[in-house]
UniProtKB/Swiss-Prot annotation:
Protein's organism: Helicobacter pylori (strain HPAG1)
EC number: 6.3.5.2
Keyword check for Nucleotide-binding: yes
Cross-referenced InterPro entries: Class_I_gatase-like, GATASE, GMP_synth_C, GMP_synth_GATase, GMP_synthase, GMPS_ATP_PPase_dom, NAD/GMP_synthase, Rossmann-like_a/b/a_fold
Protein name as it appears in the record: GMP synthase [glutamine-hydrolyzing]
Pathway: Purine metabolism; GMP biosynthesis; GMP from XMP (L-Gln route): step 1/1
Enzyme class: ligase
GO-annotated cellular components: cytosol
Active site: C78, H163, E165
Domain GMPS ATP-PPase: 190-383
Domain Glutamine amidotransferase type-1: 1-189
Superkingdom of the source species: Bacteria
Pfam family, one: NAD_synthase
Binding site for ATP: S217, G218, G219, V220, D221, S222, T223
Length: 508
C-alpha cells in the first residue's frame, strides 16, 4: 500500500486514483497525520502531494519529521519535492517565471523511476517556486525549460516538480507505477473482484442476522450499495425506493426492473401526492430543496417504522464514497459536518441506527466498476448524474403535475436523440430545464403563447468545472423540432452555452 500525505493540492485525489487504476492500493491522509497512525497502516512507500503554500513561508505545512525514520521510499510531488529539498538543506525560492500548464520534460539521467519512460514528454506544471540548489547527496534526473531540477533522487527519496497524476502528463501514470512497483516493491492486488469478495465477507460478519435499512434513489451509488448488501445478507436487507413524482420519465419502472433483474426485493413507496401538495405555491429553489428533504424524511420514517415493528433494524446503509471521507479530514481540518447522502440526512433520533458504508474506500469510477462486477448493467452504471430533489430543481418557479409531465417528455426526447447520435457517452451530463417564461409562437395558422425549454449539455471530468458541449446545429435542430412537435405546451427551445464557472451545471 502507498500512503499519500495531502498538503492541499487540488490534484491529491488523482494520485490515489492513478495508482489504483494500475492495481496498486493507495490511501490519502492529511499531512499532519500522526506517525503512530502512519505506522499502523504499514505503507510500503509515502507520496507527499503538492500544495498551494511556499515551503519557506512562516506557516508552511510540514509533516512529522519521523516519516524519515520509517525506512520506506518517499516521493515528493511539486510542494512535496520542495519540502524535501528544504528539509535536507537545499534552497527553494520564488521563480522568476512561474510555470502553469504544459511543459516539456527532458530526462537527463537514468533512474528506476523513469524505467520505460520517453526521454522527452509533456508534463503538467503548477508552481510559483522552484529549486535553486539541491541538498547534498541529491542528483538531478530531469529538467524543463524553466526548471533545471525537475526531477531529483537520493537513494530511495525522489522528487518531481511536475504533476504525474494529471492526465496531461503523458508518462505520469507510468512514473507513479514505477515508484510503487520498482522502488516500493508493491504488488498489483487492488481490483473490484477482490474488493467485492472481501467486502461481502466483512458485511456478513459485521451484520450477522441483523436487519439493514437502505434508501434507494435510483442512482449508481445506492444501487451498488443495495446489491452488495443483498449478496451478503439476502432478505435481511430492507431496500426502500421513494417515488416523489419528480423522477425522469419511466424512472420508477426502470429501477423496479433493475432490482427485479438483480433479484433484490424492493419496497416502492408512491408518495407523489404528498410531495406535490407540499410544493404547491413554492417557487424559491432552496425552499423547494428543503421541503423535498424534509418530506423524504417524513415518508422514509413512516416506512422504516413499519419494518421496525416487524423486527428491530440495527443498521442504516449509506453510499458514502472515498472523496467524502477525505474531505471530512482535509488539510483545512476536520469538517464539522461529514457529508451524507442527500436522502438520509437529518433522520429522527428514534432511528438510532449503526452506520454501514460499504463504498467508503472507493472513488466514483471504482463504484461503477464494482457495480459491473456485481452484474449491474453498463447502461445503468454510466447514466448521467441526477439531482436528489429531482425535476423540482429543473422546473424554474412553482412545480405542478403538468409541468413535470412536460419536462419529462422533453428530457426523454433530448436523451433519446443523444443516444441515437452516439453522443450520450461523450457528454458528461445532459438534461432539459423548463423555464418559467412563456413566449409567442406560431403553429399552423394559430398564435401560441407557451413555455420555453432549455437544453443543457456539458463536458467535465468531475463536475467541479465544466464547459458546454459543442453539439452540431443540425442535431440541435432535430431535437428542437421533435420537442415542439411532440410535447404539448412548448413552442420554443434554447441551448445553454454557459460554462462553470461562471454558471453552475444545474440552474437551481
Amino acid at each position: 500500500m502507498i500512503l499519500v500525505l495531502d498538503f492541499g493540492s487540488q490534484y491529491t485525489q488523482l494520485i490515489a486514483r492513478r495508482l489504483r487504476e494500475s492495481g496498486i492500493y493507495a490511501e490519502i491522509v492529511p499531512f499532519f497525520e500522526s506517525i503512530e497512525n502512519i505506522q499502523k497502516k504499514a505503507p510500503k512507500g509515502l507520496i507527499l502531494s503538492g500544495g498551494p503554500a511556499s515551503v519557506y513561508a512562516k506557516d508552511a505545512y510540514k509533516p512529522s519529521e519521523k516519516i524519515f525514520d520509517l525506512n520506506v521510499p518517499i516521493l515528493g510531488i511539486c510542494y512535496g519535492m520542495q519540502y524535501l529539498v528544504d528539509f535536507f538543506g537545499g534552497v527553494v525560492a520564488g521563480a522568476n517565471e512561474q510555470e502553469f500548464g504544459k511543459a516539456v520534460l527532458e530526462i537527463t539521467q537514468d533512474s528506476v523511476i523513469f524505467e520505460g519512460v520517453k526521454t522527452k514528454s509533456l508534463v503538467w506544471m503548477s508552481h510559483m517556486d522552484k529549486v535553486i540548489e539541491l541538498p547534498k547527496g541529491f542528483i538531478t534526473l530531469a529538467k524543463s525549460p524553466n526548471s533545471p531540477h525537475c526531477a531529483i533522487e537520493n537513494g530511495k527519496i525522489f522528487g518531481l516538480q511536475f504533476h504525474p497524476e494529471v492526465i496531461q502528463s503523458e508518462e505520469g501514470g507510468k512514473i507513479l507505477e514505477n515508484f510503487a512497483l520498482l522502488v516500493c516493491d508493491c504488488e498489483k492486488t487492488w481490483g473490484m473482484q477482490h474488493f467485492a469478495q472481501r467486502e461481502i465477507a466483512r458485511l456478513k460478519e459485521k451484520i450477522a442476522n441483523d436487519k439493514v435499512l437502505c434508501a434507494v434513489s435510483g442512482g449508481v451509488d445506492s444501487t451498488v450499495v443495495a446489491t452488495l448488501l443483498y449478496r451478503a445478507i439476502k432478505d435481511n436487507l430492507i431496500a426502500v425506493f421513494v417515488d416523489h413524482g419528480l423522477l425522469r420519465k419511466n424512472e420508477k419502472e426502470r429501477v423496479q426492473a433493475m432490482f427485479k433483474d438483480l433479484q433484490i426485493p424492493l419496497n416502492t413507496i408512491d408518495a407523489k401526492g404528498i410531495f406535490l401538495s407540499k410544493l404547491k405555491g413554492v417557487s424559491e429553489p432552496e425552499l423547494k430543496r428543503k421541503i423535498i428533504g424534509e418530506t423524504f424524511i417524513e415518508v422514509f420514517e413512516k416506512e422504516a417504522k413499519k419494518h421496525h415493528l416487524k423486527g428491530k433494524i440495527e443498521f442504516l446503509a449509506q453510499g458514502t464514497l472515498y472523496p467524502d471521507v477525505i474531505e471530512s479530514v482535509s488539510v483545512k481540518g476536520p469538517s464539522k459536518v461529514i457529508k451524507t447522502h442527500h436522502n438520509v440526512g437529518g433522520l429522527p433520533e428514534w432511528m438510532d441506527f449503526k452506520l454501514i458504508e460499504p463504498l467508503r474506500e472507493l472513488f466514483k469510477d471504482e463504484a461503477r466498476l464494482l457495480g459491473k462486477e456485481l452484474g449491474i448493467s453498463q447502461d445503468f452504471l454510466m447514466r448521467h448524474p441526477f439531482p436528489g430533489p429531482g425535476l423540482a430543481v429543473r422546473i424554474l418557479g412553482e412545480v405542478s403535475e403538468s409541468k413535470i409531465k412536460r419536462l419529462q417528455e422533453a428530457d426523454f426526447i433530448f436523451i433519446e436523440e443523444l443516444k441515437k447520435a452516439n453522443l450520450y457517452d461523450k457528454v458528461w451530463q445532459a438534461f432539459c430545464v423548463l423555464l418559467n417564461v412563456n413566449s409567442v409562437g406560431v403553429m399552423g395558422d394559430n398564435r401560441t403563447y407557451e413555455n420555453a425549454i432549455c437544453l443543457r449539455a456539458v463536458n467535465a471530468s468531475d463536475g467541479m468545472t465544466a464547459s458546454f458541449s459543442f453539439l452540431e446545429h443540425s442535431f440541435l435542430e432535430k431535437v428542437s423540432n421533435r420537442i415542439t412537435n411532440e410535447v404539448s405546451g412548448i413552442n420554443r427551445v434554447v441551448y445553454d452555452i454557459t460554462s462553470k464557472p461562471p454558471g453552475t451545471i444545474e440552474w437551481e
